[in-house]
Structures are given as C-alpha cells and as structure tokens.
Curated annotation (Swiss-Prot):
GO terms for molecular function: RNA binding; translation initiation factor activity. Residues 193-271 form the RRM domain. It comes from Drosophila yakuba. Residues 165-193 are annotated as: Disordered. It comes from the Eukaryota. This is Eukaryotic translation initiation factor 3 subunit G-2. GO terms for cellular component: eukaryotic 43S preinitiation complex; eukaryotic 48S preinitiation complex; eukaryotic translation initiation factor 3 complex. Keywords: Cytoplasm, Initiation factor, Protein biosynthesis, RNA-binding. RNA-binding component of the eukaryotic translation initiation factor 3 (eIF-3) complex, which is involved in protein synthesis of a specialized repertoire of mRNAs and, together with other initiation factors, stimulates binding of mRNA and methionyl-tRNAi to the 40S ribosome. The eIF-3 complex specifically targets and initiates translation of a subset of mRNAs involved in cell proliferation. This subunit can bind 18S rRNA. Residues 173-183 have a biased composition (Gly residues).
C-alpha cells in the first residue's frame, strides 16, 4: 500500500499514529459487525463495515480441532476467525463428499449405452436404424436404391432374348467365331455389361468411383478419363460389371442420381469401332 502524508497534529488529536482509527467489532443478536478503516487507491480514507451471521452447527471432530489450532507467524496475535488483512471472505462453496461406490453409480448413469450413442443412417436421428419411422419410405435412399437395383436386375434376367446359358465370346453375335462378323480378326472385347457414367465433377477419383458403384454389384474393370496435363477428371468414366443385370441395375439406380452437386447420366456403353 502507498504511504500517504498526514498531519501529525491530526494523528495526535485522533489518538492514533498510522492515520487510521482502530477497528472495532460488536455482537448484536445473531450478527457480528466489524468496522475497519483503510485508504483506497486515491489516498482517501474509507470506512468498511462487515456483517457476519453467527450460526451454530455440528461439525466433525477433525474440523473442530482444526479450528482450534494456534495461529503462528505474523498471525500469531490475531483473534480467532479470519483476519481481513490476510484472508478474503468470499461466497460460501458447498462440497459434498461421496464414497467410491456412489461415484461408480454416478458414472454408470452418465455412460448409459442407450443414450446419445445410436445414430440413424436414414434420418440421422438419435435412434437405431431398425427403429427409424422413415424406414422403407422415400427418405430411405438405401432401400430405394436396392429396390431399383433388384427390379432392374430382374428385368435384365427376364429378357426373352437372353437364354440364361453361358455363351462363349467367340460364339456370340459379332464374335470372332465361325460365322461371326469378326472371324479372323482376333478376339474382341465384350462391352455388353459396360456402362458410361458422365457429368462427373473434376475432383472425381478412382476411389470415389469405386465407392459409387461397389454397392450395386461386382465389376471387372473401371476407367476414369483424365486430362493429360492437369490430371483432373474429364467428366466421364466407364465401368465394366461382371454381370449384365448389375449393369442394368446401375443404369436404373444412378441415372439421374445427385452426386457431388451434379446429376449423373448413366447409359450403356456404345461399342467402339
């Protein structure tokens, strides 16, 4: 604290030498009033009156013994209770001590596995997907895609032009077998189960294309067209499915499907000349 110059005559008349009257306290009923004097930051003398409420309570023996300890050091002459020069009385904080068993029960309640853990894949709600009220509706995009894929696959299998039997490539129409259009030219690639996906974004990668078509059915080959200089996607790709019905399902499901803020266009791959 800064030292302030006071008149010695005033100090003698007031019967104190530090420029401040002595503190006093008195008890009235259940309240104790403590009056103190001090200098503020502006050098002015201020009077501070603190009020304490006296309450009688039963405390543990350890607390009672601790309160009866003899003060030491610079506080050895202080009166019982807190000293305003060394202790600041703040608001009372209530603490509750619980045992280890109660602590474990509290944590088990907070870590309830049935709360705030489940997340629905359909509507992103806080419940399991099997209990979603929108399951099977238009919001269930996975169910809708599976329905379209199954319908397209069934239509491809029920095509009367297909017998369902295995036909070697050289025996197919236009193949390299006897009587075929390409007899003597060598083996030609089969594009009957290939689809062309266009209107792709420039940031499209092979991993994204794999993620897009892997749920429809197995595929044998993929080709993503890229620019030679920049390496960015040209906007189209080819996917060769293992089965023709999966290719038909891909057209039914992905054609007109929104992906990366663009509407995809999926169609049968045209034979290369």
């Amino acid at each position: 604290m800064k030292a302030f110059n006071t008149s010695w005559a005033d100090e003698v008349d007031a019967d104190y030498v530090d420029g401040l009257p002595p503190s006093n306290e008195y008890i009235e009923g259940d309240y104790k009033y403590v009056t103190e004097y001090k200098f503020n930051d502006d050098g002015k003398k201020v009077k501070v009156v603190r009020t304490f409420k006296i309450e009688k309570q039963i405390v543990p023996k350890a607390v009672a013994r601790r309160r009866s300890w003899v003060k030491f050091g610079d506080s050895r002459l202080d009166k019982p209770g807190p000293n305003s020069q060394t202790t600041m009385a703040s608001e009372e904080i209530f603490m509750q001590f619980i045992g280890s068993k109660e602590f474990d029960q509290t944590h088990e309640t907070q870590l309830d596995p049935g709360k705030n853990i489940a997340k629905c894949r359909i509507c992103n709600g806080e419940h399991w997907s099997v209990n979603c009220p929108y399951k099977g509706t238009s919001m269930d995009s996975k169910t809708m895609m599976e329905t379209k894929a199954n319908a397209a696959a069934a239509a491809a299998i029920s095509d009367p032009s297909k017998t369902g039997k295995y036909v070697p490539p050289f025996m197919k129409d236009g193949g390299g077998g006897p009587g075929g259009k390409n007899w003597g030219r060598g083996r030609e690639r089969d594009d009957s189960s290939a689809v062309r996906i266009s209107n792709l974004s420039e940031s499209m990668t092979e991993a994204d294309l794999e993620e897009l078509v892997k749920k429809i059915g197995p595929h044998t080959k993929m080709y993503l067209a890229r620019e030679k200089n920049t390496g960015l996607c040209k906007g189209f790709a080819y996917v060769h499915f293992k089965f023709r019905q999966d290719a038909a399902a891909a057209i039914e499901v992905l054609n007109g499907h929104g992906y990366d803020h663009l509407i995809l266009c999926v169609e049968w791959s045209k034979p290369q000349p």
